[in-house]
C-alpha cells in the first residue's frame, strides 16, 4: 500500500467532525491499551485505544469490534503511522484527558500504514502530557482523568481488599506523590501495585489517573494509566529533583486529607484552614454530616506509654486475637485465618497550643511521622530497651509541630444504659514538621489575654448573680 503524499496529510489539530473528503494524518502511537471486551444484554464487542501525536496536537483513538483484529497487531507504541478513514467526534472526558475537543474511532473501512521511520518521523514528539499541578487537583471533578508530574515521597506496602460488588480480592499499593505545590495519595491496583519498584525521591510522570474523593483528594490508577520514570525530555523534571534534594519534600500539604468542593470544583469545602484548638469547639467544626479538616500549631505534652500499637492482620489491618499459649499464633476473624501479625499505631496523645488542651488519636501513618519509624520497629526497640519509649517521649514532647486534624462528631451508645451521647473525635492525619522551639508570639499573647479577659468576665457575672 502506497504512503500518501505530504500534500494529503492533515495536522491533528485541524481534524473536526465537519472535515469533508478523505483525510490522512501522520502520527506517533502512545498509550496503547490492552484489548477490552464487554458482554451486555443489549450488545457485546471488543475495543482497544491509543493516543496519536504529531507536531500540532494529540488525539485519542479507539478501535472497535472487527477492526480490532486488523489494527491491534499492526499498531505498536512509539511507531509512526499514517491513518485514514476514522470518524471524528466530540471527546468523552470520562475516558480520556487528552487535550483535544475531539476523538477518533476506527472501523473496518479505516486504513493504517506504517510510515518510513526517517528523520521527519523521529522529530514527532514521543508523548504529550497535560500536567495538572497537584494543588489544583481539588478543582477537578471526581471521576475525571489527569496527568501528574511529581516526586515519590512515600511508598506503602502492598495490601488487599475485597470488592463488594464481585467478591474479588484486589491488590493495592498507596504511593504519596508530591510537587512544590502539594502532595497527594495515588492508589495503584493489582499488577501495577505488585510491579511498583520506584523508590522515594524518584521523579515520575503519571498519565490518566482518576480523581477520587475518599477522605480528601486522591488519585487512582486506571487501565489507561502509564508511568514514565525520570523523563529527561520534560523541563520540570530537573527542577523537581533539585527541590526534593534541597527540601526532602517536607512542608507540602497533602490533599488526601482535604475534601473536594461540590462537584469537585469548590476546592475548599471541608478544609477550614489554620485554627486554634478552642476554635474547633466554638465554631462547631466537625458537627456536620461530613468530617472537616483543620491545621493547628501545637505542642505534644503527653502520650500514653503503655499502648502505642496493636497487632494487626497484614491483609486487612484489623486487630487480631492471640491463640497460642506461647504468644506465637494469632487469628484474624475478618479473614478467618491464622496470621503472622504486623504492628500498626493507635496512640492517644495530648497537645496544647498555650490556650487549650485536647486529646488526639494518631493512626498508623501519622504515628510513623510522629515516632519516625514503623510500629514494628518501635516494638522491637522497646523490647530490647525497656526505657526506650520513655526516652523517645522525652525527645518528642514539648516541641512545636503543625498537625492536620480530622474532626467529626460521632454518636455513641452507653453499653450499660443504652443512652446515646455525642462526642467530637479528632485524629491526626498529618504532622507536617517539627519546628525549633520559639518564644511566645504576639498572636499567642493576644489569644491568652483574650481568654483571660473572658474568664474574668465569667467570674464577675457569677459574683453579680450572688450579690
From Swiss-Prot:
Source organism per entry reads Crithidia fasciculata
Which stretches does the record call C4-type zinc fingers?
A: 313-335
Return the protein name: Replication factor A 51 kDa subunit
Q: Does the keyword rRNA processing apply?
A: no
Instruction: State its role.
Output: As part of the heterotrimeric replication protein A complex (RPA/RP-A), binds and stabilizes single-stranded DNA intermediates, that form during DNA replication or upon DNA stress. It prevents their reannealing and in parallel, recruits and activates different proteins and complexes involved in DNA metabolism. Thereby, it plays an essential role both in DNA replication and the cellular response to DNA damage.
GO molecular function terms attached to this record: single-stranded DNA binding; zinc ion binding
Q: How is it modified after translation?
A: The N-terminus is blocked.
Q: From the Swiss-Prot or TrEMBL record, state where the protein is found.
A: Nucleus
Which family is this protein grouped under? Answer: Belongs to the replication factor A protein 1 family.
Query: Its encoding gene is what?
Result: RPA1
Alphabetically list the UniProt keywords.
Answer: DNA replication, DNA-binding, Metal-binding, Nucleus, Zinc, Zinc-finger
Instruction: Output the GO biological process annotations, alphabetical, semicolon-separated.
Output: DNA recombination; DNA repair; DNA replication
Amino acid at each position: 500500500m502506497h504512503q500518501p503524499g505530504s500534500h494529503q496529510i492533515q495536522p491533528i489539530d485541524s481534524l473536526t467532525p465537519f472535515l469533508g473528503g478523505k483525510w490522512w494524518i501522520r502520527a506517533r502511537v502512545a498509550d496503547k491499551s490492552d484489548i477490552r471486551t464487554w458482554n451486555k444484554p443489549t450488545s457485546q464487542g471488543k475495543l482497544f485505544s491509543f493516543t496519536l501525536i504529531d507536531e500540532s496536537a494529540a488525539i485519542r483513538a479507539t478501535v472497535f469490534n472487527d477492526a480490532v483484529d486488523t489494527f491491534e497487531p499492526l499498531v505498536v507504541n512509539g511507531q509512526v503511522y499514517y491513518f485514514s478513514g476514522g470518524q471524528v467526534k466530540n471527546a468523552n472526558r470520562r475516558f480520556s484527558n487528552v487535550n483535544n475537543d475531539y476523538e477518533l474511532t476506527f472501523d473496518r473501512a479505516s486504513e493504517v500504514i506504517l510510515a518510513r521511520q526517517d528523520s521527519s518521523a523521529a522529530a514527532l514528539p514521543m508523548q504529550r502530557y497535560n500536567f495538572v499541578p497537584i494543588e489544583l487537583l481539588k478543582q477537578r471533578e471526581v471521576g475525571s482523568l489527569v496527568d501528574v508530574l511529581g516526586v515519590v515521597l512515600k511508598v506503602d506496602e502492598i495490601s488487599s481488599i475485597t470488592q463488594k460488588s464481585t467478591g474479588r480480592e484486589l491488590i493495592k499499593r498507596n504511593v504519596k506523590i508530591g510537587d512544590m505545590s502539594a502532595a497527594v495519595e495515588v492508589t495503584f491496583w493489582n499488577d501495577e501495585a505488585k510491579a511498583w519498584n520506584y523508590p522515594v525521591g524518584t521523579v515520575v510522570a503519571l498519565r490518566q489517573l482518576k480523581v477520587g474523593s475518599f477522605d480528601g483528594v486522591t488519585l487512582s490508577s486506571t487501565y489507561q494509566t502509564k508511568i514514565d520514570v525520570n523523563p529527561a525530555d520534560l523541563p520540570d523534571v530537573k527542577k523537581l529533583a533539585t527541590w526534593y534534594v534541597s527540601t526532602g519534600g517536607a512542608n507540602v500539604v497533602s490533599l488526601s486529607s482535604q475534601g473536594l468542593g461540590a462537584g469537585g470544583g469548590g476546592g475548599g469545602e471541608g478544609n477550614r484552614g489554620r485554627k486554634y484548638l478552642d476554635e474547633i469547639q466554638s465554631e462547631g467544626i466537625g458537627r456536620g454530616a461530613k468530617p472537616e479538616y483543620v491545621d493547628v500549631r501545637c505542642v505534644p505534652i503527653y502520650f500514653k506509654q503503655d499502648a502505642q500499637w496493636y497487632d494487626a492482620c497484614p491483609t486487612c489491618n484489623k486487630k487480631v486475637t492471640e491463640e497460642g499459649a506461647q504468644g506465637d499464633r494469632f487469628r484474624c476473624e475478618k479473614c478467618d485465618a491464622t496470621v503472622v501479625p504486623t504492628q500498626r499505631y493507635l496512640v492517644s496523645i495530648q497537645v496544647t497550643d498555650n490556650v487549650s488542651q485536647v486529646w488526639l488519636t494518631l493512626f498508623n501513618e501519622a504515628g510513623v511521622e510522629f515516632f519516625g519509624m514503623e510500629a514494628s520497629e518501635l516494638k522491637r526497640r522497646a523490647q530490647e530497651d525497656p526505657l526506650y519509649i520513655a526516652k523517645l517521649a522525652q525527645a518528642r514532647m514539648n516541641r512545636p509541630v503543625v498537625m492536620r486534624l480530622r474532626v467529626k462528631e460521632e454518636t455513641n451508645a452507653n453499653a450499660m444504659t443504652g443512652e446515646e451521647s455525642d462526642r467530637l473525635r479528632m485524629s491526626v492525619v498529618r504532622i507536617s514538621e517539627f519546628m525549633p522551639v520559639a518564644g511566645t508570639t504576639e498572636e499567642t499573647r493576644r489569644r491568652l489575654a483574650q481568654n483571660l479577659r473572658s474568664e474574668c468576665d465569667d467570674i464577675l457575672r457569677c459574683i453579680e448573680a450572688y450579690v
